[in-house]
Amino acid sequence: MNDFHKIANEIARIPDENLSWEERLNELVKFRAYLKEYYDSYGEDYLSFLERIEKEDDLEEKYILEYDFKKEVLSKDYNLDGLNYLLVNILFKYKLAIEDYNEYVNLLKEKYDVELKADWEKILSEKDLDLLEALSLLTFLQRSDYWDYEHMPFSYAIFDGTVDKILESIENHIDEENIEFLEIFVKE
């Protein structure tokens, strides 16, 4: 498997270029190949955990299962930590982190009525989000690591496929009309 920490450091050393929005978004979407490599390496422990958590109906029990798994397994996963670091580097290197992400995420939560749902980020990732919505949700997840590091929101979103679904939305909306809309609302 690739050393994702090393790749992240290599990306950070690339001289800044004046790339178009489309080129920058395509650089972000390339991250999906690294996700696939990581997912293909899942051991039986990971797969059985995902199945178990999907089947759990009791929200409190689900929360405990997730927390224990994050603490005992994911926090020690060097490759997942590397993916997290790599994605953060890509977001900042290519200036794809949305400054007003909270505003857009709150509008999204209202739009899809997910305010009180515990796994609202995962639910939103399964929607057909436009570029601004998808980048805002991705930025929200990345920034949430700062105030809730113990619960590993960004790493867990990478692990459980939420980030991949967001990137799929981005990939599906890289076109002239969506990019023009993004340029209007995002300050560089």
Show the residue positions of the predicted features:
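Amphipathic alpha-helical binding modules
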Residues: 140, 144-187
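Amphipathic alpha-helical elements of HEAT/ARM-like alpha-solenoid repeat scaffolds that form extended
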Residues: 27, 65, 86-88, 137-141, ...
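Short, charge/polar-rich alpha-helical segments
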Residues: 120-132
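Intrinsically disordered, low-complexity linker/tail regions enriched in Pro/Ser/Thr
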Residues: 74, 78-116
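Acidic, low-complexity, intrinsically disordered interaction modules
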Residues: 45-47, 53-82, 129-156
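Short terminal alpha-helical segments
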Residues: 2-47, 68, 84, 88-92, ...
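Alpha-helix capping and inter-helical loop/turn segments
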Residues: 40, 95-99, 112-114, 128-129, ...
